[in-house]
Amino acid sequence: MALVARRAAVPSARSSARPAFARAAPRRSVVVRAEAGAVNDDTFKNVVLESSVPVLVDFWAPWCGPCRIIAPVVDEIAGEYKDKLKCVKLNTDESPNVASEYGIRSIPTIMVFKGGKKCETIIGAVPKATIVQTVEKYLN
């Protein structure tokens, strides 16, 4: 019978404390930081309906999980389209009159307004691509 010697499991000099994927070069991407503004029952007409550019309105509530999921997406869109599109958020708990006027029954609901008129409605937490595709139809 031949005996086979085993090597002790000792880390080699080449290994490091960090896994290989962590040693890779960092990804660089440009992120435009912006936040959607806030509107309420008192400011909605002036900010949204009288806007010279299209407006994306995010109807939300602080207790709504899906609303919190899409909030950063709306903020990203606000940054990416800041010169072409106005993005605002309306808290339906604090501004029930506007929410009622536009028949908001489910949140999150996103509406796109252009020229003071409602053009499009998106209900639910949808992917960013869906929101962008909808918004781009109304940009000049």
From Swiss-Prot:
CDD domains: TRX_family. It comes from Chlamydomonas reinhardtii (Chlamydomonas smithii). Forms a complex with heterodimeric ferredoxin-thioredoxin reductase (FTR) and ferredoxin. NCBIfam families: thioredoxin (TIGR01068). It is found in: Plastid, Chloroplast. The gene is TRXM. Residues 1-34 form a transit peptide. Its main location: plastid. One of its GO terms (cellular component) is chloroplast. The record marks 65-66 as: Contributes to redox potential value. This is Thioredoxin M-type, chloroplastic. Participates in various redox reactions through the reversible oxidation of the active center dithiol to a disulfide. The M form is known to activate NADP-malate dehydrogenase. Keywords: Chloroplast, Disulfide bond, Electron transport, Plastid, Redox-active center, Transit peptide, Transport. Pfam families: Thioredoxin. The keyword Cell membrane does not apply. Disulfide bonds join 64-67. One of its GO terms (molecular function) is protein-disulfide reductase activity.
